[in-house]
């Protein structure tokens, strides 16, 4: 009987304590995410522009996001005659794509896909442009 009284008292105390708490305020709470965190503000277009400014070949840039992104889950895609710049919403998504696609370079959420004629020296130069943009 005494154990039953102790249990009932504990349940009542717990109910009283939790009942005295304020309900959460409406809207987003501190520490909660309302969407994917923004990794950086670097766009595919800005990367292509920086590549051109560095003297690298980026002829015929065209937005191919509508064609490529639904299948590979990117958020931006600019293709040139030599390199394609893909931007993903997360680093994990970029890593997944780059890991499954030979001949790519990945830094954070950006992936470069090189054309067959791009030399090793030019690949390194393209990669340096991306790394600089992400600083």
Stretches found by the model and what they are:
Residues 1-11:
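N-terminal export and membrane-targeting signals
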Residues 81-135:
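Extracytosolic low-complexity repeat regions of secreted or lipid-anchored proteins
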Residues 26-45, 49, 132-135:
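Low-complexity, Pro/Thr/Ser/Glu-rich flexible segments characteristic
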């Amino acid at each position: 009987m005494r154990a039953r009284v102790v249990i009932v008292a504990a349940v009542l105390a717990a109910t009283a304590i939790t009942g005295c708490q304020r309900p959460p305020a409406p809207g987003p709470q501190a520490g909660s995410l309302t969407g994917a965190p923004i990794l950086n503000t670097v766009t595919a277009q800005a990367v292509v522009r920086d590549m051109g400014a560095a003297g690298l070949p980026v002829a015929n840039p065209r937005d191919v996001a509508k064609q490529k992104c639904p299948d590979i889950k990117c958020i931006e895609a600019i293709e040139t005659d030599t390199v394609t710049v893909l931007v993903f919403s997360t680093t994990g998504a970029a890593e997944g794509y780059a890991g499954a696609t030979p001949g790519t370079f990945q830094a954070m959420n950006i992936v470069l896909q090189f054309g067959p004629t791009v030399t090793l020296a030019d690949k390194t130069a393209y990669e340096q442009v991306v790394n600089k943009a992400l600083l």
